[in-house]
Amino acid sequence: MSEMTPREIVSELDKHIIGQDNAKRSVAIALRNRWRRMQLNEELRHEVTPKNILMIGPTGVGKTEIARRLAKLANAPFIKVEATKFTEVGYVGKEVDSIIRDLTDAAVKMVRVQAIEKNRYRAEELAEERILDVLIPPAKNNWGQTEQQQEPSAARQAFRKKLREGQLDDKEIEIDLAAAPMGVEIMAPPGMEEMTSQLQSMFQNLGGQKQKARKLKIKDAMKLLIEEEAAKLVNPEELKQDAIDAVEQHGIVFIDEIDKICKRGESSGPDVSREGVQRDLLPLVEGCTVSTKHGMVKTDHILFIASGAFQIAKPSDLIPELQGRLPIRVELQALTTSDFERILTEPNASITVQYKALMATEGVNIEFTESGIKRIAEAAWQVNESTENIGARRLHTVLERLMEEISYDASDLSGQSITIDADYVSKHLDALVADEDLSRFIL
């Protein structure tokens, strides 16, 4: 679990997301409160429930990007889902309980990686011994059993030194490795993924653990043996319990496009993928117990962050019970021309940096001038205003169009430098930006 302070979290998010300070502060406080809660005594800790967040803002302003970056910072079980993928219980489609099942699967994977990393040093020692046993087979007694030697032989120590120095990396050896489990593909109808995974694991267990002799270079064998030995040192039952604890205490669920499951106007007939989904989400957000293949998971202390553009629907169109369970509202602002300029230059891996790096692979040096950046930002903002406002995503469309000619001819331009200034941008984009009909189809 992350121990970063809210200021540190916001500072980290600032490296990738421009503006939206209110949203960054809210998620930073929510993340820090997870850590604060774990410092309380057990009785009080059980009473402190997370304050779920609803992020409201037009498309392309950074809602989903905040979720993506938060997943890396959280160091906790995290899952991002689209609200539109779910249907009401009893209808064809995914049920909302699968959110918690997927979150638990992600937690098991995360905890397994951490456990393997924790045992890595011991696993390396065991893998080294197995390779040395192949290079210098241990002595056997009259009954064909391996004798336990008090001290390793001089030859074994010499080979160990060579192995550690990488002198034997390219030498081929034949070694017994765990065979891959029997793969069984099962095609199941939507909504029955849980049964499918249980059947697959059952068929895999039928085969048992078999060994298979493989001929490999020592450096490749070492990697596989370390993984195999580390997996043996991990207790599967303990791992499952740790994963469930991690989900229950630190789990974070990000639900995107929640505005798409709002009921719009008066409609007759069942609304199975809108209001029905909201009703099914209620117990999860409020706190219930969900059955997963790893065990029962309580959702009382899982943090839910929902987001939506709410361009047609309004937050008040959500059913009242769900509104009450999303107490923190954060409004994200529409992006301006100056925001677009900052997006093109400030983030660690901004779009302009990506294009420069891609063209550098062909030996072409691209330089974006300040006037060029400003003109690109103005063009993107202008197209957003005259057609549909898709926020920062418009920059990708505009830049792709601008760089199309260079990308096509890059292999013939090796060794050249190209400067993208205001004149270059105007020459390639002005006609398209000015013609609204062309903008709708091309930009």
UniProtKB/Swiss-Prot annotation:
GO cellular component: HslUV protease complex
Induction remarks: By heat shock.
InterPro entries, A to Z: AAA+_ATPase (IPR003593), ATP-dep_Clp_protease_ClpX (IPR050052), ATPase_AAA_core (IPR003959), Clp_ATPase_C (IPR019489), HslU (IPR004491), P-loop_NTPase (IPR027417)
Keyword rRNA processing: no
Binding positions for ATP per the UniProt entry: I18, G60, V61, G62, K63, T64, E65, D256, E321, R393
Similarity-based family: Belongs to the ClpX chaperone family. HslU subfamily.
Subunit structure: A double ring-shaped homohexamer of HslV is capped on each side by a ring-shaped HslU homohexamer. The assembly of the HslU/HslV complex is dependent on binding of ATP.
UniProt name for this protein: ATP-dependent protease ATPase subunit HslU
